[in-house]
């Protein structure tokens, strides 16, 4: 009687979260090339107050008080909010910048369909 090791088939790891991150990154890169946007907390607040922002992206490690303030202004200006899954370094890299980006506001998406996300 041979005691061959039996292993249960390993389920493939789902990369659903990674895939959605990739799509938002590619849409964001297209927005950076063809659309209008502002980077940073103060500039985003100004665009939210003026009602020009269509979408705001907030990095995962943004301070909670800033997050809630941005969400409040977005609610007042009827702007959608996307909580980016990565930190501010990842968001800066996704924007094609060599610096950290905590918050960005999309004013005009250009050729990208990021507003549908």
From Swiss-Prot:
Keywords: Cytoplasm, Ribonucleoprotein, Ribosomal protein. InterPro entries: Ribosomal_eL30-like, Ribosomal_eL30-like_sf, Ribosomal_eL30_CS, Ribosomal_eL8/eL30/eS12/Gad45. One of its GO terms (molecular function) is structural constituent of ribosome. Transmembrane segments: none annotated. It is found in: Cytoplasm. Gene3D superfamilies: 3.30.1330.30. Pfam families: Ribosomal_L7Ae. It comes from the Eukaryota. Residues 1-14 have a biased composition (Low complexity). One of its GO terms (biological process) is rRNA processing. Its main location: cytoplasm. GO terms for cellular component: cytosol; cytosolic large ribosomal subunit; preribosome. Residues 1-22 are annotated as: Disordered. The keyword Cell wall biogenesis/degradation does not apply. Component of the large ribosomal subunit (LSU). Mature yeast ribosomes consist of a small (40S) and a large (60S) subunit. The 40S small subunit contains 1 molecule of ribosomal RNA (18S rRNA) and at least 33 different proteins. The large 60S subunit contains 3 rRNA molecules (25S, 5.8S and 5S rRNA) and at least 46 different proteins. There are 2 genes for eL30 in S.pombe. PANTHER family: RIBOSOMAL PROTEIN L30. Belongs to the eukaryotic ribosomal protein eL30 family. Component of the ribosome, a large ribonucleoprotein complex responsible for the synthesis of proteins in the cell. The small ribosomal subunit (SSU) binds messenger RNAs (mRNAs) and translates the encoded message by selecting cognate aminoacyl-transfer RNA (tRNA) molecules. The large subunit (LSU) contains the ribosomal catalytic site termed the peptidyl transferase center (PTC), which catalyzes the formation of peptide bonds, thereby polymerizing the amino acids delivered by tRNAs into a polypeptide chain. This is Large ribosomal subunit protein eL30B. It comes from Schizosaccharomyces pombe (strain 972 / ATCC 24843) (Fission yeast).
């Amino acid at each position: 009687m041979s005691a061959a090791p039996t292993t249960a088939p390993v389920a493939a790891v789902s990369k659903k979260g990674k895939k959605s991150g990739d799509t938002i990154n590619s849409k964001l890169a297209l927005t950076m090339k063809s659309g209008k946007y502002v980077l940073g907390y103060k500039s985003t607040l100004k665009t939210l107050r003026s009602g020009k922002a269509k979408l705001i992206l907030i990095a995962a490690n943004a301070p909670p008080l800033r997050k809630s303030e941005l969400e409040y202004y977005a609610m007042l200006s009827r702007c959608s909010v996307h909580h980016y899954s990565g930190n501010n370094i990842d968001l800066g890299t996704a924007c094609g910048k060599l610096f950290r980006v905590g918050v960005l506001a999309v004013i005009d998406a250009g050729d990208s369909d990021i507003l549908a996300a």
